[in-house]
Amino acid sequence: MAWIQIRLNSTNEKAEQMSDFLEEIGSVSVTFMDSQDTPIFEPLPGETRLWGNTDVIALFDAETDMAEIVRLLKEAKHLDSNTAYKIGTNRRLKNWEREWMDNFHPMQFGKRLWICPSWRDVPDENAVNVMLDPGLAFGTGTHPTTALCLEWLDGLDLKDKSVIDFGCGSGILAIAALKLGAKSAVGIDIDPQAILASRNNAEQNGVTDRLQLFLSDEKPSDLKADVVVANILAGPLKELYPIISQLVKPNGDLGLSGILETQAQSVCDTYTQTFALEPVAAREEWCRITGKLKTL
């Protein structure tokens, strides 16, 4: 199917409103990208996952009068002399879902753990295999931040431990922890679609009896765990420090990712108040910060 793309530079505060308006005037799809063309995959507990400088990309049918779209954007004050935009034409829209499924293969993380798409055979039946169908939620293991978290979990002794996956997306981290030996896990997310995807993946892996799922505003106030992992972004990690740090039991383990290497020091400066931090692990400009809750 032929399509026309309009790409508009926006800000954290305006991107969601612009997205809603684009859908109202006929866009068939709206996505967010940061300034480095990295997809913004999922909302975080308590807020929307957006960088400060965000590009909003909307697709329209090839027959759309883009001059009229631009006029409507200007009329609604979503487009002004300070808003940069580009319009692209004569490209073909791929069957992205089919292509993504064809390219998603089993992946190994650490020594024991494999993440396997539910439509493929497992490569090692004796390994710890997590069967995954992400649906519309973020988290397949292909992104460096997810990979760093999975490798960290694989390296922990999770036997009889409790785990919290803060911003659970597809549930991949919580489910992996359970299959690696954790006694119980809790997944938290703001998006009902993430809760649904996590529940479906838990059923696929036979761990529904050990996994609790909560929307962020419904989680128990006294919730704590031996291991807490949060694969979100540097800004929210710092803002949510009081909440995240309170989730960790005494001498418990914390794993943070979704952080660019250039942002690692500022996140470390925040969490070193109450955590004994380990050396930062990095991959493809992203990094993971881990540590133990300090004891008094």
Curated annotation (Swiss-Prot):
Gene3D superfamilies: Vaccinia Virus protein VP39 (3.40.50.150)
Similarity section: Belongs to the methyltransferase superfamily. PrmA family.
Listed CDD domains: AdoMet_MTases (cd02440)
One Pfam entry name: PrmA
A GO CC annotation given for this chain: cytosol
Alphabetical list of NCBIfam families matching this protein: prmA
Substrates-to-products reaction catalysed: L-lysyl-[protein] + 3 S-adenosyl-L-methionine = N(6),N(6),N(6)-trimethyl-L-lysyl-[protein] + 3 S-adenosyl-L-homocysteine + 3 H(+)
Free-text function comment from the UniProt entry: Methylates ribosomal protein L11.
Matching PANTHER family: ELECTRON TRANSFER FLAVOPROTEIN BETA SUBUNIT LYSINE METHYLTRANSFERASE (PTHR43648:SF1)
Root EC class: transferase
Residues holding S-adenosyl-L-methionine: 146, 167, 189, 231
The entry's keywords: Cytoplasm, Methyltransferase, S-adenosyl-L-methionine, Transferase
HAMAP family xref list: Methyltr_PrmA
Major localization listed first in the record, in broad terms: cytoplasm
Biological processes annotated in GO: methylation
EC number, UniProt record: 2.1.1.-
Gene Ontology MF: a single term: protein-lysine N-methyltransferase activity
Keyword Transferase on entry: yes
Superkingdom of source: Bacteria
InterPro entries referenced in this protein's UniProt entry, alphabetically: Ribosomal_L11_MeTrfase_PrmA, Ribosomal_PrmA_MeTrfase, SAM-dependent_MTases_sf
Protein name, per record: Ribosomal protein L11 methyltransferase
Subcellular localization, as worded in the UniProt entry: Cytoplasm
